[in-house]
Amino acid sequence: MAMRRWTDAGTTWFAISGVGRELAAPAERLLMDYQRDGGEWRRGYPADTPGLDICWQNFTSCAELMLRQAARLQPVPWRETLHELCRRTSGRESGWWLAGSTALAVRGASIEPGDIDLVCSGDAARSLGTIFADALIEPVVYDTSSPISDYWGRAFVTARLEWIGAPKAGVDSPSPSDFGPVAASRLETVTWEGWQLRVPPLDLQRAVSQRRELTTRVALIDAMLNQ
């Protein structure tokens, strides 16, 4: 596996190549917003973006482990990552809530998340970028042209931690998502290992899982709904 960084015409690029056959599929998923050029994935940032040096250092040090976790070749210590998230944001105005598989896992579902997905406001997205400045693998991105959200952030703290800030109303059309404004208006609070965590309602997560044809996940949610 090889990584390189360069700056051209005011843009600094991060690139990774030579991931190998066993990591090719997870690379396609994790690096889906990178540009693909043959066997290399690359992403550019304005060269004057604050924090690029630490992002590059973190990216190069954790990229292989991150891909191996995504391929399930290495365990994903999501509990450790979530505890660190809770510790770092405790008492601070971060305003995040859980989405995806981790939102089910903290309810007690028999599921092992591959990462931790968060949803928050735009201000909170920037705040998380400050709180995790030492662990960012990409700078927090502000992109109003995205159909999903205005902000994106990614860090690696023993496992991948991703967040979106200010999700767009369009993510709830034609059907509500489990990470958009509809879910945000219906959040529930659960207790997990001493922490109070906000999660979307199970019926929304079930509907999303059914649309994605995640039959095993639907069965897990049904079991929780029938308790």
Annotate the PLM regions.
Residues G108-I111, V157-R160, L225-Q227:
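Generic structural signal for short, solvent-exposed loop/turn connectors between secondary structure elements
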